[in-house]
Amino acid sequence: MVFPFLVVLTIIFLALVKNVNSKLNNPDDTSFGSETSGSQSEENKDDDFPPVDEVFQNNKEPERESEPVFTQTQEPEPEPKPEPEPVVPLKTYDSLYGLIGKPLAHSTSMVRFNKFFRDQHIDAHYNNYELESIEDVTKLIEKYPNLRGFNVTIPYKQDIIPYLTRLDETAQSIGAVNTVKVLHRDGGVELIGYNTDWTGFTKSFGELLEGHSKALILGTGGVSKAVKYALDKMGIENRFVSRNSNFEIMGYYELSPSVMDEFDVIVNCTPIGMWPDVNQCPDIPYGFLSEKHLLLDVIANPDETMFMKKGREHGATAKGGKDMLEQQAVAAWEIWDRIGE
């Protein structure tokens, strides 16, 4: 009886081995090992153990874009160049103002006006326009249709007049213009000329000039004419002094001790001594100056010119043109800011 019993056990053992091998070779069959997995559902198994191909798919490196392949006869197409950005100002202002003349490196008007515009919250900007020729003023106005006005400095204070529509009465009398108002009317442009140099001179130097009776005006340019107009208004006798002398204009060689003693006011209306040539000064006999003399310089840069310095060394009172520049600028803005005319 033992032998048949052993045969039966052997058959059962072989069947079990076969079943185990079948389970190992077929992992999708979930009937094997269900007792050791407890009550875990198929859904929970899938959540805890994602498929192997999904795991590898999620961890694969991203595919690189294939680079173009070119044969020897095929050249790569050039990348299109970006269109250049248009050159535009950082801000478009409602109104433009400026200064015309040549040279303009010495001028401080742009800094002063733009500070004024910022402080007063005025939508405007002031630029320097250095013109090679006064004829370029027409191109300037065409280029900037929002140009509302401009100042004029050397050497164009008299040359600008033929380009103006009209002059105000004072500018007509002086024969020089330092302020122009630009009006746009009925599709056209009107240029009206004014002179605020004489206003600036009067307000800046008027108090110092009290008690003086005779003045020498060095130079015969546009600002010289404005100074003469102001001195005439004050009742101060005056004479021009120039290298080009004639019956009415004295020469520098005529400045004798007696002449220097007679004229106790000397006004420098030349650009001599203006920045950057700060070591230069008009050729007058400074040794004849004394404490009774008053030297006035319309130059605003530098604050103290060599003309002023030499005058002070001989006891004279001296004042520069910085305040005069500010006063004439205030008068110019009042003209530009008026509505109509």
Which residue stretches match the model-derived regions?
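N-terminal signal-anchor transmembrane alpha helix of single-pass membrane proteins
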Residues: 2-24
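Acidic, proline-/serine-/threonine-rich low-complexity intrinsically disordered repeat tracts
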Residues: 38, 42-47, 53-91
